[in-house]
């Protein structure tokens, strides 16, 4: 029987979840998860150039203290990985804070993600717009999406450690366009640059199944499988599965279907990062 992994989940330590970490862990265990990765949001990408700690949403000391104790409680029963999701920004103050978090708390793994442009999350819509003669107008889709892909590529050169490259295609979730898709063929050059860098840097491409069965987003997975197929064709083999769960019912959502698709492409294992080691788990 294959071991079940879910690497990159959240709890109430993140600003967008209301579920206690203990409940998330209990639910994961009940669902048979063997490797469960907690990656709470460290949203230093919304600093707007400031350094005041009160702007940082997460209570990092409380999080790591609590999670490490729970990790000990589950030892021998479920492998709990205590990680962090670092929202990339070009803000050097944020880079310094991420480095300090790594040095002080040594997360088991780090997820590298793009949620924002100029400190504003795509969720709020602003990165899709510009101002012309004082009037707010939508950017052309290609311009907005290429800007997003450029940010991902820059994030791969982040001056702090990370293991997983998360949910490529996040920009499509909240886009105002009639056709929100970001097909590989239309952005091949920039996507190939990203995928090749992931391979060359020996990082892990995340297959994110958040809301897989809900039909809420244009893509059932991030990235779309055309990009995953291209990653495999380029030689990429390090992949991880993430439900990106923020509530118990979302844990391992879509995993069975995603595994079937990955096997059809030719993948044979997931890669689970833990303290610098890559653990290979058969699909």
Tell me the role of every PLM-derived stretch.
Residues 153, 159-162, 179-182, 189, ...:
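C-terminal functional module detector
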Residues 168, 236-252, 272-275:
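Short acidic/histidine-rich active-site segments
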Residues 207, 214-241, 256:
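Extended hydrophobic/aromatic segments used for targeting, binding, or gating
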Residues 2-6, 35-37, 79-83, 108-111, ...:
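Structural preference for beta-strand elements that scaffold enzyme active sites
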Residues 8, 28, 110, 167, ...:
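Conserved, mostly hydrophobic/aromatic
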Residues 188-204, 211, 215-220:
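Active-site acidic/histidine proton-transfer and metal-coordination neighborhood
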Residues 1-100, 104, 174-188, 209, ...:
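An N-terminally biased module of ancient metal coordination in phosphate/nucleic-acid-related enzymes
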Residues 50, 57-200:
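Extended substrate/RNA-proximal surfaces in nucleic-acid metabolism proteins
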């Amino acid at each position: 029987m294959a071991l079940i992994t879910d690497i990159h989940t959240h709890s109430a330590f993140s600003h967008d979840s209301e579920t206690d970490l203990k409940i998330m862990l209990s639910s994961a265990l009940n669902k048979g998860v063997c490797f469960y990765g907690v990656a709470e949001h460290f949203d230093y990408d919304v600093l707007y150039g400031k350094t005041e700690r009160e702007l940082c949403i997460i209570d990092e000391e409380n999080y790591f203290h609590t999670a490490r104790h729970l990790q000990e409680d589950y030892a021998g029963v479920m492998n709990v990985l205590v990680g962090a999701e670092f929202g990339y920004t070009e803000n050097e103050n944020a880079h310094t804070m991420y480095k300090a978090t790594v040095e002080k708390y040594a997360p088991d793994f780090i997820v590298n993600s793009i949620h924002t442009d100029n400190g504003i999350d795509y969720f709020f819509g602003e990165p899709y717009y510009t101002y012309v003669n004082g009037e707010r107008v939508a950017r052309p889709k290609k311009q907005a999406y290429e800007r997003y892909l450029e940010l991902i590529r820059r994030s791969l050169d982040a001056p702090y450690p990370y293991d997983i490259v998360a949910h490529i295609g996040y920009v499509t979730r909240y886009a105002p366009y009639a056709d929100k898709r970001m097909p590989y063929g239309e952005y091949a050059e920039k996507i190939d640059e990203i995928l090749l860098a992931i391979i060359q840097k020996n990082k892990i491409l995340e297959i994110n199944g958040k809301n897989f069965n809900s039909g809420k987003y244009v893509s059932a997975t991030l990235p779309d499988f055309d990009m995953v197929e291209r990653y495999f064709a380029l030689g990429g083999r390090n992949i991880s599965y993430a439900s990106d769960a923020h509530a118990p019912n979302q844990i391992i959502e879509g995993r069975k279907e995603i595994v079937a698709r990955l096997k059809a492409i030719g993948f044979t294992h997931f890669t689970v990062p833990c303290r610098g080691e890559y653990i290979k788990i058969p699909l």
